[in-house]
Structures are given as C-alpha cells and as structure tokens.
Amino acid sequence: MRFLPDVYKRQVRAGGGFNHRYNLSDGVLLKDNHIGAAGSVTKAVQMAKEYAPFVRKIEVEVENLDMVKEAVEAGADIIMLDNMSVEEMKEAIRIIDGRAQTECSGNVTKENIDHLTSLGVDYISSGALTHSAPVLDISLKNLHAL
C-alpha cells in the first residue's frame, strides 16, 4: 500500500507537526550505512553534493562528537544528533557554533521534549508521532472482485 506513507505525513501536518522530508528531492539524509559505504562523513557529503546538486539540504546523522566535527567541516547543512546524551548535545551545539542547523533525534518523549528544546537545537524529530499513534482498523477491498 504505497500511498500510506503520504497519509501518515498528512496526518502529522494536520496535527501541527512538520515532516522531515516529504519526498527524496527535499534533501539528502546521510545515515550510518551511507557513511560506511562512502568511507567517511566527508566523502559521503562530497558525493551527495556531486551526485545530487539539485537537493535543498544535506543532512548528516551523527552518533559522536568526532562525527559532529567532520560533518561541520564537510559542509553539512543540518547535523542530526542521534541518541546523544544531553551533555553530548550541548558540546555538539558548541562545536557546530551556528555553522549548520541542528536536529536532535532518538529517545524523544513528551516528558523530555521541553528540556531538549531548551538546549538550542533547531529541530527535534520524534518517530513517536507515527509509530506510537493509535491504529485505526480499516479494510481495503476491491469491490469488483466480490
């Protein structure tokens, strides 16, 4: 059911949220598997710029402060601080120093979102908006087949 991701994205927007990306042309998100295949954060960002110059933003998901430094130097537009402690996020924001936008991701809950906001990140992403939402039991039937 290929249309369901669009439905989920519309539901997030209807509830006042913003989608990370609506489709692949909105931006490149470089995750651990892309970085591993490229060999480094720097090489992954260079390849994204070379092969997808039409995209609006290049975002790099980082897991530690060394990756933060490399993403900044490589020219990432957005740096996603994934599953970092509050102390690591504070240090990452200090290192980035406004040279890229920041996003916090991983273990975001209703209980800690206000505190995460106070750290000064530009974006906070939470999968809980879609993966923890109550499910509606619906059925799709082809009436012509009945």
Named regions from a protein language model:
Residues 85-89:
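Nucleotide-binding motor/catalytic cores of P-loop/tubulin-like NTPases across gene-expression machines
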Residues 110:
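Cys/His-rich Zn2+-binding cysteine-cluster or related metal-binding knuckle/ribbon modules and their
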Residues 128-146:
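Short, charged, intrinsically disordered terminal tails
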